[in-house]
């Protein structure tokens, strides 16, 4: 199991969650994403626009698109829809869709553990050009908008802590998204 660390971040304020929280990125075709952002200018999806959403003749350069994504992020943060968490935290999340429910932990994991092949196992072959685009996004926009999901073998101690926290604390956010997921 890799080391995990709490982190500080901007969290959407509860009253803005339905408008701001992005449906699953890969649930949309590029054309659907483009239409969605036009209809939902306050949605975080406007911060993670990609070149494949544009017709070839209308596509901006990658540099220009990333600058626009950064401007969209600054606009969202300036709008008062997010609050900064001063104290580094670990975050639990629970998603419920129909009969399916999943719970996870949002935390930081040192990149070194992944790069060294320790604890975090590579599960897919990634394309170098996409890795370079993601790095350019993080450097230009200044946000980690593509978290990596990790799983772990069942550990009763972890499950007990998660259960205790969920039973003893009210959720910071509790809403149903535009795609019906709570």
Give short role names for the model-derived ranges.
Residues 1-182:
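A cross-family signal for N-terminal binding/gating loops and helix N-caps
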